[in-house]
Amino acid sequence: MELTLNEKRLLVALGPMGSADAAVLAEKMDTRREAVVQYANLAGDRGLVDVEKHVARRYVPTEEGRAYMGKGLPERQVLESFEESIPMRDLQGHPLAKIAIGWMRKKGWIAITGGVVQKTGKTAPGPDEAAFVRLAEKGEIADGEGVADLAKRGLAIEEETVAYTVSITPRGRELLSQGLDLREEAGTLTREQILSGEWKSLPLRRYDVTKLPKRAYPGKVHPYQRIIDEMRRILFDMGFEEMSGGIVQSSFWNFDALFQPQDHPAREMQDTFFLGERRPLPAGYERVRDMHEHGGETSSTGWGGTWSAEKAEQCVLRTHTTSLSIQHLAAHPKPPVKAFCIGRVYRREAIDPTHLAEFEQLEGIVMDEDVNLRHLLGFLKEFYAKMGFEKVRFRPGYFPYTEPSVEPEVYVDGLGWVELGGSGIFRQEVTAPFGIEHPVLAWGLGISRVAMLRLGLRDLRHLYRSDIEWIRETPVYGGRR
């Protein structure tokens, strides 16, 4: 059996006594008690010693408790400061009155009538006073009657003392009888020891290279947050800047500015979280109004009907981050623009394994002279490739504010082709009211869908759980790809 030098020293020190307190062994071995406990636990794992833990609890006075020692509890001091009765006004002049009056009444020592404090004659010391006297005499006391009351009042505090008794086992004594080599073992070798050959005569510490080390659990970023951070880093590397905005948006920016008709089903109560707040319309909103009613100055016919400013002022929890994209474009109508947003959006969804009422969405826009659909497909293919999806394809799609529109799909082993968001080129009805004269490429995707594929999850709700074991076991690289 291979023992460390400290285990051997422990057995040698313990042998003559058979059993001893760790503090005694520490003095004999010229080391710390904590070190002895560590050596004993190692030897205990080998069956050479038994380690017994003893926990003793005691109460010691607090700073306030020490202030009363030799004088008595506040209520006793105040009670003994007057004869049979005293006006309340005079009693309140005592420095301990605020503490003592309540306790004297609670213990039944006094009665207060007409502003006069009268002793009741029932002033025998209770368990708390007896405990306080013992505490003052000894400086510490064990738990007992009245001690808990002192602790509740902040006059005493519990302290825990842990002691360890180490006893040698028959197996340990047998090993000790065979003799132990107490020479210092070398755990490392210097260059000089190797060159001179001195290492050949040194007692070398033995290592079991087949034994697994204790598993370490360092701090880890939540797997879902790690994927979000990865997406953000990829887009920064692709030359995008990040845009941000509030989760509360007016219906104007969330719907109307994106040429979504005011009677569209997505604007119904069952799909959107409407708020009681209203916000004024921005300058130039009339161009959006005209676009809805008759197509403005474009060849579009618009949606017809009468556009309602009141509906546009109604605030909602944003249903998509595209509301931030159009505001960014309105503030930067001249190219080049290359921006993205990662943010939470809100929908009135029935919660189940594939739907949540709130989730994260990624939104990207590119505006420049002469950009077209091929540029859009190139951006998307590069982004998904950097996310680890090697096979990407596109199929035609439809979205209210883009034309043409495409839906990107990625190939996942075991699942086949999976749709991951929507994209297209903003319609003229969206860009014209804000003086944007160049094409705007736009795309968005639900980050949670990507995360589920990367992490191999089947329930969307698991992305938001605080399961420490799951966080520990999930590979840092992001899991399945």
Swiss-Prot record:
Cofactor note: Binds 2 magnesium ions per tetramer.
Molecular function per GO: ATP binding; magnesium ion binding; phenylalanine-tRNA ligase activity; tRNA binding
Catalysed reactions, as listed in the record: tRNA(Phe) + L-phenylalanine + ATP = L-phenylalanyl-tRNA(Phe) + AMP + diphosphate + H(+)
Residues the entry annotates as binding L-phenylalanine: T322, Q361, L362, E363, Y401, F426
The protein's required cofactors: Mg(2+)
CDD domains per UniProt: PheRS_alpha_core
Listed EC numbers: 6.1.1.20
EC class: ligase
Compartment list: Cytoplasm
InterPro entries: aa-tRNA-synth_II (IPR006195), aa-tRNA-synth_II/BPL/LPL (IPR045864), Phe-tRNA-synth_IIc_asu (IPR004529), Phe_tRNA_ligase_alpha_bac/arc (IPR022917), Phenylalanyl-tRNA_Synthase (IPR002319)
GO cellular component: cytoplasm
Cited HAMAP family: Phe_tRNA_synth_alpha2
Subunit structure of this chain's protein: Tetramer of two alpha and two beta subunits.
Family listed: Belongs to the class-II aminoacyl-tRNA synthetase family. Phe-tRNA synthetase alpha subunit type 2 subfamily.
Protein name: Phenylalanine--tRNA ligase alpha subunit
Biological source species: Methanoculleus marisnigri (strain ATCC 35101 / DSM 1498 / JR1)
Lineage of the species this protein comes from: Archaea, Methanobacteriati, Methanobacteriota, Stenosarchaea group, Methanomicrobia
